[in-house]
């Protein structure tokens, strides 16, 4: 570095003779540029020019303002618009203002002192010039100080733009002065022994001007104006916070506090004393909250006329350009000081070798090293923190924007993206962009950092650097190609992981059906297949990353070997300073080589995410113009559609419903009827504006309420679901419970209306969910009610009560559109709309439509056919002289209509010739009148939930340190302790080889070996050591990868096996989101992060040990400082980890509710929009986002709090070591050992931080192992197969079932649900099971399938006690059609025959019998036709028929029907019943039904009430006597009669 001795470094003159040095090898232009930037004379000229320009501009603006004020006073207009009495205001200042004032005053004082000093001490020739320079600078700084102080008086929220620009230029000039001063101190010029005034000024001014630079970027003055009404500055970024809130101290922290993370101290103190809980973590600062960011994002969204192609990217840049610029400045500051250490190695080596001009030079070197390391550490962690904070703000902004968009999407757009994909936009793409912020600047910083390194290496090694460039280029290309390969592998890995997660989610959602069908093995194998594909890509991905890591860790030693070989060949002298400066620069270059390719890939992924988000955010929204809505409109029409044609597809002109013309008057009840798939629900959707309007006009008068066919229940309390955001009105609330028949439910539920409803209403019966939905609608008191098949899931009595008390009672006077399959209610509606093939084919009153026949006649005929079964039973009772009647007077109905062949039988008379006795006029029945009224009322009015207690448990959360058992479990799962021992061995051996190479370099470059230096031996030995090092790092990397993969696969199989064989009660009490988080986030941590972190921790600690060994070996007094500082490190770790560990746990806990609420809202968006509750749901989303991000924010703060302190300790150890080296005599410490020690010590701060941080990181990630372990220890249900007790292959061969005193409770210490049930069912019998909602009907089926184990009694089927059988042997022998038809994503074939046991011929035969052959055959893919998630592209009726097809293929001897036809119309019901009667004539059938006709042709009927078998006999015999069943039949008949 010969150029450091140039005279122009200290010459204040601008003579050209100082510029060009003939001896220099640099070109003349480069020497001129160097002179202009680094010589004091041009620097002073530049500084004075900036000062003078600033003063002139300031003077110009002052004159202009003075003239303007004078003119205003002359015209008397200055105060004309001001109020006579101003509002009371108070001005306060934050730490930012105080810091700015202090800095400007200090700069002013220093400038004045230097001005006076220059006048009295400068030599005569330059006294005037020197004094004038400092005078101009002093005047400028004084003016700035006065200006800043006056900002408080004028209550200015932001600094003038002129001042902010000046501070930026002043920082640049001061940086040039500082660099020049450092070079001056390092030069060989004898004048460097004494400090110049310029050097002193620059060293003092540099940190101060850096502070002002940050202030200029922020823009805010820190002055806050508080009025009597509003406590917020007009335009300030400082937001005043309510004192009562537990707001993050970051909001009110001073500049110093933010700089050194002092604002984190109170929270860390709390966490150290006791484990943190949710309430102790402060909320976000107001400027960081989601609601403010959402408003900002919306205001910056490109206007339509801008025609932006990338609106999301454009908006994010507009919102956060200041934050992006600030992090860029921090990155540049870090880059400017990162190479100071390596440059100083040569100076230290020269100093200790005797080339010292004065003792003070050594102290100057230590001081420069200390300042450089401090700036590096501070800028690094401020960059990390602010980048993470920026990422957090972007994620928060995107989540709220995506959520708001999700509430506006059309049905077609929502289906195109899919609920799962929309959730991925929020969970994956937003996170991708957030994570990108840490790597954003690496893309343009990497070329600068490498270029700086090459320049330094060239000045050190000369032409030998060519080999370095070639080697680095080769490594860079290898890493780039490897990273691209990793990206491909990662993409495939994510795709396969998504498939595995989708299959897992599907399994969890429909676990009850899977257990009923004994498909656990099938789904286990299915998920394992997805996992095997995922594991294949995971292995490729991890081994590829291991290859990149090998190259990165080998870079310093590999490039050093190439470079030194070239240097020796070219005859370059290698001394200690040159060698260790080179190796240190190579170590620093590891970072950009590592980060740049990944940054490029991350940028590419971010651009893909932005493209996906652009497509989503630009998706079509529901048009407000689709429906004309008006409040308090004139006229009698409440709902009207004229010439309406509607499509579900925004781009398709093919209508789903067309030629719609109808109107419903205010207060009318209009029923919409039709067969399955006729368009009834679509008609309601068109009224709500949910469909794409192709033509026509839709008009709705007033507010709307909507009750969906498929219940949408929120995860919350019953009360929350009913209130739906409205305040509690107790009298109205109680009345709503009454009319919706929920009073008894509230009484029985353990917590009443505060009972928590599980995910998707899992702890409620179908009827309870439907009634809660209805109660929610009724409580809203809307004008127009759209009810979609609300009676399908409730029994006859409950349905009648709801119709009378609610529909015709509480909602009387409201306009109601009721979709229903219950023909019974149609007598009492004002208008009936009959639909077929997407059109309204008939419209009118009941009498009119019945007389016309056609479609409505067919519906009534189907209903009448089913009623004949009821009346036939009644006729039998009549024939036995047992008259049936009711205390209620019955109406006779006589309808005249022409009889036609095959027309429905609709004529009713009062003649006793008719066998339909239940429809005759009232007559007293002595036996029925003797029936206990209380028992009837209790039976008819009871709605006992089968399990009303709080099912959803709080998530288990460990506190304190992760136990040693968790570490032991992970470490020993694959190969016992030997696995971890090998990891440590390879790490220690590799580090030892690196130390050997460095010791060899020190030995060969020592002064005593200068004469006997043998280049061949030097290179040969170094290359051998380098090769050994590379082999060891290969072994370590690949072994850690293998160990991690094996352990991850073991854990996955354990948790999958545990889940598949978990009892149903586990899934009832555990939300699927909680399970999925284990299968996704926690499994990913075990798959990828933990293995490499363990390897890295071992490496970091062995590296740290090597640094301490080398440092203490040559600067042994340092050990006295290392011991206390080491203890301080350990204390900091424990202090930090206590809070960080809990924050990580809380982050996991608060993240799931954000995802759950997002997906829940998208699933129920029709309901939300119908009630106009979008603002309430957006607010809830914001609340959950803030709750989660506050954990993220404070966790990031704690990370940088720790990192800054640990790296600072490392820097102090380094500087203390360097101080001892310069203090020790040169005959005690050798120059080569100084170089070796410094080359190790320069990385001490980083290694120390990463060693501690990664160990904390592992502990946080070990929480994932802890959480997985919780689910691998789930108590399993009974054995899957019992070899000693296998039933015969043809079992059950008769179908005889005997229950002996069977008792069932769902969980210990809960009431019995079945209370001693004893019944006997003969083979081939058809048993109908009836009872009120929650009476225990479904529990009966569950205990027969052993989804819940009996608490007492026996169940004998064909002579075998089912509790002695394996679960698979039991369940696989039964057939069941569940209440809710479940289809899995896939094809028709995979749904009807999941286990692939049957031929295509058998499948087609089954489809033909269940009336679906024509539907499937009409599709191009036939049996491979697509079935969407949950069968959404198939109607409810078609889904039920497919479920019937499964049972027909299975041909089980015992068949269970669990309200299988509750959601279909009478025609479809009749068809299903006919198929079952014909195809299962010799089978035992147990049918649970709400529809009485379904059980009237059964051999026997079981009446269950409150868990007891109250009646069990044939329908005729039960009707012959005073029975509960008779009362139920009578109730149903009365309802059908329209009473």
UniProtKB/Swiss-Prot annotation:
The chain crosses the membrane at residues 45-65, 100-120, 131-151, 165-185, 197-217, 247-267, 324-344, 363-383, 437-457, 461-481, 549-569, 976-996, 1015-1035, 1088-1108, 1112-1132, 1209-1229, 1238-1258. ATP 1 binds at residues 674-681. The modification Phosphoserine is found at residue 894. GO terms for molecular function: ABC-type xenobiotic transporter activity; ATP binding; ATP hydrolysis activity; ATPase-coupled transmembrane transporter activity. GO terms for cellular component: cytosol; Golgi apparatus; plant-type vacuole; vacuolar membrane; vacuole. Pfam families: ABC_membrane, ABC_tran. It comes from the Eukaryota. InterPro entries: AAA+_ATPase, ABC1_TM_dom, ABC1_TM_sf, ABC_transporter-like_ATP-bd, ABC_transporter-like_CS, ABC_transporter_C-like, ABCC_6TM_D1, ABCC_6TM_D2. The keyword Cytoplasm does not apply. ATP 2 binds at residues 1331-1338. Pump for glutathione S-conjugates. Belongs to the ABC transporter superfamily. ABCC family. Conjugate transporter (TC 3.A.1.208) subfamily. This is ABC transporter C family member 14. It comes from Arabidopsis thaliana.
């Amino acid at each position: 570095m010969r150029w450091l001795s140039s005279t122009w470094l200290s010459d204040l003159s601008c003579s050209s003779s100082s510029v060009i040095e003939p001896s220099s090898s640099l070109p003349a232009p480069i020497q001129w540029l160097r002179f202009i930037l680094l010589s004091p004379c041009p620097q002073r000229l530049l500084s004075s020019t900036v000062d003078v320009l600033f003063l002139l501009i300031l003077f110009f603006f002052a004159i202009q303002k003075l003239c303007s004020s004078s003119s205003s006073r002359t015209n008397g207009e200055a105060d004309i618009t001001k109020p006579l009495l101003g509002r009371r205001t108070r001005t306060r200042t934050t730490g930012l203002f105080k810091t700015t004032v202090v800095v400007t005053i200090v700069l002013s004082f220093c400038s004045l002192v230097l001005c006076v000093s220059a006048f009295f001490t400068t030599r005569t020739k330059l006294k005037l010039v020197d004094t004038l320079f400092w005078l101009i600078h002093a005047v400028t700084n004084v003016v700035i100080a006065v200006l800043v102080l006056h900002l408080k008086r004028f209550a200015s929220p932001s600094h003038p733009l002129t001042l902010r620009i000046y501070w930026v230029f002043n920082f640049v000039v001061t940086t040039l002065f500082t660099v020049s001063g450092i070079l001056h101190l390092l030069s060989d010029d004898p004048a460097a022994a004494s400090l110049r005034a310029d050097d002193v000024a620059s060293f003092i001014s540099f940190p101060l001007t850096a502070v002002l630079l940050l202030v200029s970027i922020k823009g805010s003055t820190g002055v806050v104006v508080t009025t009597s009404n509003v406590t917020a500055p007009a335009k300030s970024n400082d937001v005043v916070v309510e004192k009562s809130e537990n707001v993050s101290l970051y909001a009110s922290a001073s500049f110093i506090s933010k700089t050194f993370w002092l604002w984190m101290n109170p929270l860390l103190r709390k966490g150290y004393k006791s484990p943190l809980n949710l309430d102790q973590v402060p909320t976000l600062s107001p400027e960081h909250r989601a609601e403010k960011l959402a408003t900002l994002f919306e205001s910056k969204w490109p206007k339509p006329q801008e025609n932006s192609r990338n609106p999301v990217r454009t908006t994010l840049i507009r919102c956060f350009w200041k934050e992006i610029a600030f992090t860029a400045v921090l990155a540049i500051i870090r880059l400017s000081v990162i190479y100071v250490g390596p440059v100083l190695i040569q100076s230290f080596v020269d100093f200790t070798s005797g080339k010292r001009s004065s003792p003070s030079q050594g102290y100057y070197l230590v001081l420069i090293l200390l300042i450089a390391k401090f700036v590096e550490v501070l800028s690094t962690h401020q960059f990390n923190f602010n980048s993470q904070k920026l990422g957090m703000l972007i994620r928060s902004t995107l989540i709220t924007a995506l959520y708001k968009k999700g509430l506006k999407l059309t049905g077609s757009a929502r289906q195109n993206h899919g609920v799962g994909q929309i959730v991925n936009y929020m969970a994956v793409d937003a996170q991708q962009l957030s994570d990108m912020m840490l790597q954003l600047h690496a893309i343009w910083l990497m070329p600068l950092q490498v270029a700086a390194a090459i320049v330094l290496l060239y000045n050190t090694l000369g032409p030998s650097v060519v080999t370095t460039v070639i080697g680095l280029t080769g490594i860079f290309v290898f890493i780039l190609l490897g990273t691209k390969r990793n990206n491909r592998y990662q993409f495939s890995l994510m795709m396969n992981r998504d498939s595995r997660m989708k299959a897992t989610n599907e399994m969890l959602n429909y676990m009850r059906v899977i257990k009923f069908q004994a498909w656990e093995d099938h789904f286990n194998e299915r998920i394992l297949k997805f996992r095997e594909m995922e594991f294949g890509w995971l292995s490729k991905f991890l081994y590829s990353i291991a290859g990149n890591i090998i190259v990165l860790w080998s870079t310093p030693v590999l490039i050093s070997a190439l470079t030194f070989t070239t240097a020796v060949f070219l005859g370059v002298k290698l001394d200690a300073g040159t060698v260790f400066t080179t190796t240190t620069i190579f170590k620093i270059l590891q970072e950009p080589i590592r980060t740049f390719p990944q940054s490029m890939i991350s940028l590419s992924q971010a651009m893909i995410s932005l493209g996906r988000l652009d497509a989503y955010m630009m998706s079509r929204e529901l048009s407000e113009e689709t429906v004309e809505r008006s409040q308090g409109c004139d006229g009698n029409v409440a709902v009207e559609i004229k010439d309406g044609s509607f499509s579900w597809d925004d781009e398709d002109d093919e209508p789903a419903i067309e030629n719609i013309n109808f109107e419903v008057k205010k207060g009318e009840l209009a029923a919409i009827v039709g067969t399955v798939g006729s368009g009834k629900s679509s008609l309601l959707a068109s009224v709500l504006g949910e469909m794409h309007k192709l033509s026509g006009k839709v008009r709705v008068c007033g507010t709307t309420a909507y009750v969906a066919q498929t219940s949408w229940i929120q995860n919350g309390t019953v009360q929350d679901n009913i209130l739906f955001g409205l305040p509690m009105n107790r009298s109205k609330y109680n009345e709503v419970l009454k009319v919706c028949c929920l009073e008894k439910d509230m009484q029985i539920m353990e917590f009443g209306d505060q009972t928590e409803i599980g995910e998707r209403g899992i702890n409620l019966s179908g009827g309870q969910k439907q009634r809660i939905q209805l109660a929610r609608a009724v409580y809203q008191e809307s004008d127009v009610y759209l009810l979609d098949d609300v009676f399908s899931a409730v029994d006859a009595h409950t349905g009648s009560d709801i119709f009378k008390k609610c529909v015709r009672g509480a909602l009387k006077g409201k306009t109601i559109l009721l979709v229903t399959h219950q023909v019974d209610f149609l007598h009492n509606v004002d208008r009936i709309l009959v639909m077929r093939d997407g059109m309204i084919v008939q419209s009118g009153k009941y009498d009119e439509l019945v007389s016309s026949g056609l479609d409505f006649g067919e519906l009534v005929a189907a209903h009448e056919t089913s009623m004949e079964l009821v009346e036939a039973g009644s006729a039998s009772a009549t024939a036995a002289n047992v008259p049936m009647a009711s205390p209620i007077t019955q109406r006779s109905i006589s309808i005249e209509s022409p009889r036609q062949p095959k027309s429905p039988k609709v004529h009713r008379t009062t003649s006793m010739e008719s066998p339909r006795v239940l429809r005759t006029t009232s007559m007293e029945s002595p036996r029925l009148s003797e029936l206990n009224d209380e028992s009837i009322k209790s039976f008819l009015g009871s709605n006992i939930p089968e399990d009303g207690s709080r099912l959803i448990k709080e998530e288990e959360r460990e506190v304190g340190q992760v136990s040693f058992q968790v570490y032991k479990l992970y470490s020993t799962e694959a190969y016992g302790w030997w696995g971890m021992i090998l990891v440590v061995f390879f790490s220690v051996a590799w580090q030892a080889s690196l130390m050997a190479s460095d010791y060899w370099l020190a030995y060969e470059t020592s002064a005593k070996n200068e004469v006997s230096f043998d280049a061949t031996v030097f290179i040969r030995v170094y290359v051998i050591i380098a090769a050994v090092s590379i082999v060891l790092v290969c072994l370590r990397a690949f072994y850690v990868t293998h160990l991690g993969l094996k352990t991850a696969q073991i854990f996955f199989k354990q948790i999958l096996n545990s889940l598949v064989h978990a009892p149903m009660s586990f899934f009832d009490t555990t939300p699927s989101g909680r399970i999925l988080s284990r299968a996704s986030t926690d499994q990913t941590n075990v798959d990828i992060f933990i293995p490499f972190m363990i390897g890295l921790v071992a490496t970091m600690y062995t590296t740290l040990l090597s640094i301490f060994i080398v440092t203490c070996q040559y600067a042994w007094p340092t050990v006295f400082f290392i011991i206390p500082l080491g203890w301080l490190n350990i204390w900091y770790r424990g202090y930090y980890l206590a809070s960080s560990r809990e924050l990580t746990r809380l982050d996991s806990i608060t993240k799931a509710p954000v995802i759950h609420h997002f997906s829940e809202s998208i699933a129920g968006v029709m309901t939300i929009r119908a009630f106009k509750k979008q603002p309430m749901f957006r607010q809830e989303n914001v609340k959950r986002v803030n709750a989660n991000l506050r954990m993220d924010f404070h966790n990031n703060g704690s990370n940088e709090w720790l990192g800054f302190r640990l790296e600072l300790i490392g820097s102090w150890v380094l500087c203390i070591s360097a101080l001892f080296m310069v203090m020790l005599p040169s005959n005690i410490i050798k120059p080569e050992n100084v170089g070796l020690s410094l080359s190790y010590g320069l990385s001490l701060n980083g290694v120390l931080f990463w060693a501690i941080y990664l160990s904390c990181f592992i502990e946080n990630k070990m929480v994932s192992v802890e959480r997985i372990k919780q689910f691998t220890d789930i108590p399993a249900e009974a054995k899957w197969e019992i070899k000693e007790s296998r039933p015969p292959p043809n079992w059950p061969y008769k179908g005889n079932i005997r229950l002996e005193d069977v008792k069932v409770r769902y969980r210990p210490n809960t009431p019995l649900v079945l209370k001693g049930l004893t019944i006997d069912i003969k083979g081939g019998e058809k048993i109908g099971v009836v009872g009120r909602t929650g009476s225990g009907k479904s529990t009966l089926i569950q205990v027969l399938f052993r989804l819940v184990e009996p608490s007492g009694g026996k169940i004998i089927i064909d002579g075998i006690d089912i509790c002695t059988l394996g679960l698979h042997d039991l369940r696989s022998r039964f057939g069941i059609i569940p209440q809710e038809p479940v289809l899995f994503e896939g094809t028709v074939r995979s749904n009807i025959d999941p286990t692939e046991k049957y031929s295509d011929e058998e499948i087609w035969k089954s489809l033909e019998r269940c009336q679906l052959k024509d539907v499937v055959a009409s599709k191009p893919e036939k049996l491979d036709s697509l079935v969407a998630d949950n069968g959404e592209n198939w109607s409810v009726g078609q889904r039920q028929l497919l479920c019937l097809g499964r049972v027909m293929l299975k041909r089980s001897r015992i068949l269970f029907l669990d309200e299988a036809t509750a959601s279909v119309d009478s025609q479809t019901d009749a068809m299903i019943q006919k198929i079952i009667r014909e195809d299962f004539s010799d089978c035992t059938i147990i049918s649970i039904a709400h529809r009485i006709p379904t059980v009237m042709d059964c051999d026997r009927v079981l009446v269950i009430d409150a868990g007891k078998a109250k009646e069990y006999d044939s329908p005729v015999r039960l009707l012959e006597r005073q029975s509960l069943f008779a009362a139920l039949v009578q109730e149903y008949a009365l309802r059908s009669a329209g009473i």
